[in-house]
């Protein structure tokens, strides 16, 4: 009788455990379940985006053009239409420092909202730098180190991208120079200190280190700066240093590519609880975060197996997708970048900080990619 009672008790515990597993707060993966490839949505797009143009001749940019700034690995990925691009073993091994990231059920938020909907969020804040930015910083710096580069140059707004690059540069033993928008530079000393701890040199932008910065300071000595100005300074600085390469946190195809580990993990995690979302919502600035979670889900819509609504939430201070004009424009104030086809409020538009659209996201917005219908919600 005691043995029977014990077995019944164990069976009862087992049933409770099964029930708990079916409705968890967090859905976790093992390191072996980290994606082995990045997903390139260009491989599934029937209509390709308009080409990025060289401003000197208004012709499509070439590999040679980008090779002046970026590592060879990133240049290859920028022009690739291959659907799946293998993640290098060394990069995937470094991803294991914090990946896979949890998919969390927001049960208390559901209760407060009084909704029957299941709300999940992907917690990318567990990365060493505190954001999704590290997903691209590590491969970009990896490819630069592979090319024999000794120094990495970049820009940052609030400091998340700069922190991610500083962390990656420290892993590969490279020097790191960060141009940080002056407003956040003064307002967020903790981010600045974090970059310093990882060995980066941080310069407030606009600065006296570049012609773009000097011009801005001459016009307004008290300028708080903008991300567009910081990009210009970083590109100018990198262009004159033969031993360095520039890395960027949004804009380019290869950045969006690297971020797709987010959505791929989500798909695997939902499979663990036999769920699949009908709506994907993500904040949208330069497009990397939105693309990271949305693009892998768009694959199933493009092949006709699923129907999903994609919602982008953009800042009301820079409503580029909802109020911007679709045209070719620079991605920075100083006109150092190529010309991108995108929804833009103008490269010289000056909110705090400066924003511009991501070309591939913009192409989705004009409905050439029917999975993205352009539901746009303004954040504060």
What is each model feature region?
Residues 14-149:
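Positively charged, low-complexity intrinsically disordered leader regions
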Residues 99, 119-123, 153-154, 203-205, ...:
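General beta-strand structural signal in soluble alpha/beta enzymes
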Residues 116-127, 146-152, 244-251, 273-278, ...:
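Glycine/charged-rich beta-loop-alpha catalytic/anionic-binding loops adjacent to active sites
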Residues 136, 144-183, 276-289, 310:
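A short, small-residue-rich loop immediately preceding and capping a beta-strand
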């Amino acid at each position: 009788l005691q043995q029977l009672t014990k077995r019944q008790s164990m069976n009862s515990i087992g049933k409770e455990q099964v029930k708990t597993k079916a409705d968890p707060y967090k859905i976790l993966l093992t390191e072996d379940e980290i994606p082995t490839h990045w997903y390139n949505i260009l491989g599934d797009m029937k209509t390709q985006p308009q080409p990025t143009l060289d401003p000197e001749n208004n012709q499509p940019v070439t590999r040679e053009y980008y090779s002046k700034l970026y590592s060879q690995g990133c240049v290859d990925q920028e022009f690739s239409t291959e659907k799946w691009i293998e993640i290098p073993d060394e990069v995937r091994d470094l991803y294991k420092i914090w990946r896979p990231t949890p998919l969390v059920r927001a049960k208390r938020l559901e209760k407060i909202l009084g909704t029957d909907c299941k709300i999940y969020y992907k917690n990318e804040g567990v990365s060493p730098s505190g954001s999704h930015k590290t997903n691209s910083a590590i491969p970009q710096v990896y490819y630069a180190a592979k090319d024999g580069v000794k120094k990495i140059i970049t820009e940052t707004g609030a400091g998340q991208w700069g922190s991610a690059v500083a962390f990656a540069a420290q892993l590969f033993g490279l020097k790191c120079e960060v141009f940080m928008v002056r407003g956040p530079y003064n307002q967020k000393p903790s981010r600045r200190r974090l970059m310093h701890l990882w060995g980066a040199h941080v310069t407030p932008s606009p600065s006296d280190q570049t012609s773009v910065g000097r011009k801005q300071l001459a016009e307004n000595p008290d300028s708080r700066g903008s991300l567009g100005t910081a990009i210009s300074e970083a590109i100018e600085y990198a262009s004159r240093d033969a031993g360095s390469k520039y890395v960027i946190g949004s804009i380019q195809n290869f950045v969006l590519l690297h971020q797709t580990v987010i959505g791929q993990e989500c798909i695997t995690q939902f499979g663990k609880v036999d769920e699949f979302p009908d709506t994907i919502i993500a904040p949208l600035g330069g497009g990397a975060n939105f693309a990271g979670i949305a693009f892998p889900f768009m694959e199933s819509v493009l092949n006709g197996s699923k129907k999903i609504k994609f919602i982008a939430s953009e800042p009301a201070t820079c409503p580029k997708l909802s109020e911007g004009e679709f045209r070719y424009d620079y991605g920075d104030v100083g006109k150092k970048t190529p010309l991108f086809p995108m929804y833009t409020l103008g490269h010289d538009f000056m909110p705090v900080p400066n924003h511009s659209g991501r070309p591939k996201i913009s192409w989705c917005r004009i409905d050439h990619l029917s999975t993205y219908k352009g539901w746009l919600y303004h954040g504060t």
